Amino acid sequence: VLSPADKTNVKTAWGKVGAHAGDYGADALERMFLSFPTTKTYFPHFDLSHGSAQVKGHGKKVADALSNAVAHVDDMPNALSALSDLHAHKLRVDPVNFKLLSHCLLVTLAAHHPADFTPAVHASLDKFLASVSTVLTSKYR
């Protein structure tokens, strides 16, 4: 459960992402594909090369979903319900992949905002991304 301090940290950190959200989403996806090559199997139709328009497009979708989760941090199950259905029933993404992408998102945010990535912010973002992952995998059961 996110504390009030966690929610503040997440909103502040994500606010600094701003217009870079799509780029950071794509960066995190590229990191995931390079670090965890098995994740590429979910994107057989994508050009996975650096800077690919498809990776950038999906990175924007990831970032938009996270922006939605931040905006509805107190009601993520409803805010992410359609996305949870999509990943569970149509795409059938292995739930472990959400943890892998979450890790890569943390690395991306730390790389782009090192001065702001304090231990407290890191912990809050980690808890937030774990909550998002839990919501996205809730329809698997």
Curated annotation (Swiss-Prot):
Keywords: Acetylation, Heme, Iron, Metal-binding, Oxygen transport, Phosphoprotein, Transport. Heme b binds at residue 87. One of its GO terms (molecular function) is organic acid binding. It holds the Pfam family Globin. Residues 1-141 form the Globin domain. The modification Phosphothreonine is found at residues 8, 108, 134, 137. The modification Phosphoserine is found at residues 3, 35, 49, 102, 124, 131, 138. The modification N6-succinyllysine is found at residues 7, 11, 16, 40. GO terms for biological process: hydrogen peroxide catabolic process. The modification N6-acetyllysine is found at residue 16. It comes from the Eukaryota. InterPro entries: Globin, Globin-like_sf, Globin/Proto, Hemoglobin_a-typ, Hemoglobin_oxygen_transport, Hemoglobin_pi. O2 binds at residue 58. Coiled coil: none annotated. The modification Phosphotyrosine is found at residue 24. GO terms for cellular component: blood microparticle; haptoglobin-hemoglobin complex; hemoglobin complex. Belongs to the globin family. Involved in oxygen transport from the lung to the various peripheral tissues. This is Hemoglobin subunit alpha. It comes from Cebus capucinus. The lineage of its organism: Eukaryota, Metazoa, Chordata, Craniata, Vertebrata.
